[in-house]
Amino acid sequence: MSRWSVSQGCGNSHKALRMSGNREQLLSGWGAPGMLRPSMRSEAERQRSFRAWPRSCPQLSPVELARSGFYYLGPGDRVQCFSCGGVLRSWEPGDRPDTEHRKFFPSCPFLQQQQRGPGATDSVDGQVLGQLSGEEPDRTWEPVYPEMSEEQVRLGSFSTWPLDVPGSPEVLAGAGFFYTGHRDHVKCFHCDGGLQNWEQGDDPWTEHAKWFPMCDFLLQVKGEAFIRSVQESLFSSPEPSPESLGSYDYDRSLASSTESVSVPRAPTPGERSEPPKVSGPPLSTEEQLQRLKEERMCKVCMDKDVSMLFVPCGHLVVCTECAPNLRHCPICRAAIRGSVRAFMS
C-alpha cells in the first residue's frame, strides 16, 4: 500500500482542492459542489468542528475560520467552505481566512451573499443564506448505515475477509468499520468513510482519526484528545518519498474530459501560488450546463454521475459502481487510501 503523510506543514504554500473531476489545482471560480455537510451552514456548528484542529498550526482563530464559511475537514489543517465546497490547506502565519477564501474562490455564493448583504437570496440554490446562520445546528449526525450500528453485526460482515490481508476483523469492527466485500475495502457505519490498502501495523482507530476526524462515532468513543493527537502527528511526519506517493503522471486522455479550468504550473518550494487567470469569452448558459454535466460524469463508465471522493488525492471522478475496482486514481495515478461518498447538490 502506498502511504501518504501530510507533508505540507504550516509553512508551505497554500493549495486549494477542487471536489470535481479535475486534478488537484487552484481555482478562480466556483465549481461543481462536492461533499458538503448541510449542518455546516450554521456558523456555531462550524466552530464546533474545529475541536480537533492541530495546535501546531499557526494561530488561526476557529471563530474567524467559521465566520469565513470554513469548517474543519482534516487531515492536517484542511478546511472546507460549506457553500462552494472549496478546500484550503497549508496555512501560513499571518494568513487571513477571508482573504484566502476570496483569493482562491471569488465566485463562492457565500462570499457573494456577504457582499450583497443580509437577506439576499443565493442564486445557486434559491435559499436565503443570511438566515442559515441562525439555523438550529444538527448536534449529532445519524449513522449512514444504521443496520451496522451493532459491533457484532459489523464483525459478521468480515466472514469473507481475505486471510492474506493485514488487519484484525475484531479490531476493525470495534473501530466502526464493516467489510464491503471488495478486496480489503472497509467503511465506517457512521460517517461512511472508506479505507483500503491496509498494511501490517496499521491501527484502525488511528487511520479513522487521520482521514475522517469529524466522525461523530469516533469522537464519542475516542474523544477529542485522541483525534487531536493523531492530527498533530501528521505535521511531524517525515517528507514522503516519490515512491510512497505513487506516480503522478497524468492520464491525458482522462484529463482532457475535465478541462474546465487550466492547470497551473506547480509552484516551487517557498513560492506563493497565485490563482489562475481565466481568459476567453464567457460561456453561454447551455455551454455551462454541458460542461457541468461532463464534470459530473463518471470518467470510467462515462454513464453514471460521479459519487465517490478518493482519499488522499481528493479527486471526485467515478461512480459508486466503478470505485471498488480501482486501486489508483485515474486522474493523478496516486494510490487510493480510502474513499467517501459525495452528495451532489
UniProtKB/Swiss-Prot annotation:
Disulfide bonds: none
InterPro entries named in the record: BIR_rpt, IAP, Znf_RING, Znf_RING/FYVE/PHD
Keywords on record: Apoptosis, Cytoplasm, Developmental protein, Metal-binding, Phosphoprotein, Protease inhibitor, Repeat, Thiol protease inhibitor, Transferase, Ubl conjugation, Ubl conjugation pathway, Zinc, Zinc-finger
UniProt cross-references to Pfam families, sorted A to Z: BIR, zf-C3HC4_3
Residue spans of the BIR repeats: 46-112, 154-219
Name the UniProt record assigns to this protein: Baculoviral IAP repeat-containing protein 7-B
Recorded GO MF terms: cysteine-type endopeptidase inhibitor activity; cysteine-type endopeptidase inhibitor activity involved in apoptotic process; ubiquitin protein ligase activity; zinc ion binding
Function: Weak apoptotic suppressor. Has E3 ubiquitin-protein ligase activity. Weak inhibitor of caspase activity.
ZnF bounds (RING-type): 298-333
Species in which this protein is naturally found: Xenopus laevis
Modified residues (Phosphoserine): 237, 241, 253, 257
Reaction catalysed by this enzyme: S-ubiquitinyl-[E2 ubiquitin-conjugating enzyme]-L-cysteine + [acceptor protein]-L-lysine = [E2 ubiquitin-conjugating enzyme]-L-cysteine + N(6)-ubiquitinyl-[acceptor protein]-L-lysine
One GO term (biological process): protein autoubiquitination
Domain commentary: The BIR2 domain is required for caspase-inhibition. The C-terminal region containing the RING finger domain is required for the initial degradation step, and the final digestion of cleavage fragments.
Location(s), subcellular: Cytoplasm
EC category: transferase
PANTHER family reported for this sequence: BACULOVIRAL IAP REPEAT-CONTAINING PROTEIN 7 (PTHR10044:SF163), INHIBITOR OF APOPTOSIS (PTHR10044)
The EC number(s) this enzyme carries: 2.3.2.27
